[in-house]
Amino acid sequence: MVFFANFGIMDLKIDEILRAYDAGETDLICVLGPTASGKTRFAVNLCREITRLRGTSEPAAEIISGDSRQVYRGMDIGTGKDLCEYGEIPYHLIDIADAGTRYNIYEYQHDFEAAYKDITGRGKVPVLCGGSGLYIEAATCGYALPQVPPDEELRAELEQEDIEELREKLAELRPITDPSVMESKRRIIRALEVAFYERKHPVRRTGFLPKNTYFIGTDVSREERIARIDRRLDERLAEGMIEEVKGLIDNGVAPADLMYYGLEYKFVTQYVLGILSFDEMRTLLANAIHQFSKRQMTWFRGMERRGTVIHWVKP
């Protein structure tokens, strides 16, 4: 029996997981976790261990990204792509859309299906890795996501409420992992519109696999996660995150579109435009990322309450 003990307090029996995959009992391995929890490094080492067990010269497993912002080209430092970390392991659904466009969950579900079928069609093991709870559930639950039509009557009613009331109402209806949603009244109203629609029209499953995902969650203590976030933020600022945002603007990406992506791109853009000082930007951004990581964990705990079994490890 092969244990994967170097990357977690819970020894993962990778050979047993692989046997379950080969027997059709598991058809996808998913590594999820909040930001700065080490999930990418964990997923890469997992793929390497699968390759070793397979005894092949080429990678026997490939990674599908489950990140809502790493799809955009040119948004590298701010989204933490860290592509060098993948080494020889192939990855999918990174750098597939232009910065300034608005890639959505419907496109992701379609692209995930294509990547999954490509990987499994070549006899490789698919490993989904990411922290975007909505994207992960869209891929692993096989939901048939509806194209929600506008409800003008509901919109007019919600427009009468202030943004704080709308935030509270949305928080009661569904967890939000994209922090930029909560900063725009228009986007909150749209999210509420979708939530109310889904209550009246229950989401059904598609016929697409996977149906039996083995979930591995990477987590560290709250204190360590905060320290990692702060350290990584300073590293990214030193590596040129501000210059990256300036370059995107110089290449024609509208500041409003960058701010739409939230977190790093919202606050760094405001700094570049002179709206915030450097210290204000650094403080507000760090706080926003801390809150974002908390919401990610809330989403994953919600998955567990809905019946998903997540095997938690501490990288």
Annotate each predicted stretch with a short phrase.
Residues 3-315:
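Phosphate/pyrophosphate-binding catalytic cores of soluble transferases and nucleic-acid-acting enzymes
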